[in-house]
Amino acid sequence: MRIKSFKSRAFALVSTTALLATLVVASPAHAAATGPTCDGATPVQTCTGTTSDGAAYKMMVPATFAGTVTIWSHGFGGNTTIPGVFAVDSSAQLAPNGPGQNGGSPDLIKYLTDKGVAVMGSGFSTQGWNLDEAVKTNAELIGIFKAKFTTTTKVVAWGYSMGGGITQAFAEQHPELISSAAVMNPVDAWGSQSKYFIDLLWLMKTWFDPSIKLTGYAAGAAGDMQMLGDLQKYTAILTALKAGVASGAWPTTSSASGKALQAGGIPSRSALLMIGRLAGISAQSSSFDGIVGPPGAAATAWPLAYAPALATLENIAGVLGYSLLGARDMQNKMGGTSFDNQKTDYSKQLSDEDRTVYNAAFSGNTAIAGMLQTLSPLNPDAPRIKGDAAALAKSASTMYESTGKIKVPTVMMIGQHDPVEPAGIVQRISDLYEEDFAAAKAAAKKAAQKSGAYSAPARKLQVLWSVTPKSWSKFDADGAPISIVGTPGTGHTNFTMAQYKLVIDTAIAAAANGELPWTGAQLSKVTKAKGLKIDRDTLYPWMKYYNK
């Protein structure tokens, strides 16, 4: 996603009144399409313009253009500018960014144009949850490109995070416009992704700070200030939980139910882990592998009691801002609260496997039962979210819900422990595709009984899992954990340029040949890119939304 990391210190430097005065809320632009205006430069010319929704676009076309163009969809961006914190960015994006980059990695763009491949992308007319708007923009942009560059033969769609979801939705709705797709750590359909976000936020509010508003924000800048106030409170919760991991102390802002659990001897780390398991957040993170512990007496207790909670904490910190901004953005878009958990049975969201594997970290069966009991809809201290009927109806009738169907040759890449888009999103797509592929094979065999010739169906999905090392946690001389950034297979959109090149090369090859490469040469390229694995036997849990 595109927004920068939230920095809590930024809020302390600006008064509420001053911040309110400087908030800028972006609205979708609407205008006639313009361009493309091209500079005619060589060896690569640049063309710019806007689609009919006002979205800025950019194209870079080499003089050696051989007919293939990529269309990039960028990740999540906020719709509100807050000076010093984050800004609305509607500039055109052409490819994944490297550290500190915007608009697309120059190295990656050159890598493609040197091959005779053109690149294009949009900034989109609105940010936030913009899947539906982006799909329309991309369809129009492809038409503009083909009209200008009439020798175009292949279009390859790709994107990550929000853009990964956009690319998957585009491939589902407009397979006739593209030849292949590269989908990286995609958001799930809004129904599923929003449940993941809101479950996390509601559970933290319910146990750790019931003064958090979360829903019913005011319109405009005043509501943005309320959301920022909530963000400060969530950040304070994480700070308190980190400080209390060893002692088990709960945040002082905890609800009556939370304080009762504390009085019953349940440490805050057990509640923190419970929130993670109920929402579906990984218990392994960039710093915590859940395997290696500090030397000495804590070595046994560490992986059982402490590491899962600390990993959950680190992952929550990674997804918190996206969750809150996503919830706020959708409230603006739908005109009210479009999430409802009045009928959710959270006890059913705790799997039998989690009850067993994390039993010690949960502080035992009695503690598990006690924590789940406080989440009952009958508990007045845990008020549920009641969605606004009109907002729920608008969401259901206007938001496209991705099916996960694979309609064009598609390569996917995702980290095992991405905190924003869990691996279960791609696992579900992979599982559904295996069912479709099995049905296609059965149909081919049946047809062969009549024709006498068997024509095997081609696999249309190749999943590249970004995997972790066998272990990676580190500790200082005092046994304190050392923070680690960028561990492969963890974090959000944590990919290397070599991996991006492999993914887009795979998609381009699929576009050229009509099917994905499964040769030994392809497997060698996967190995050479490092940290990736093709595995059709993975069993990552689906998002909780599908537990029906």
Q: What role is predicted for each listed range?
A:
Residues 2-31:
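Secretory targeting and sorting signals
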Residues 32-160, 165-548:
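C-terminal His-loop and adjacent cap/lid subdomain of alpha/beta-hydrolase
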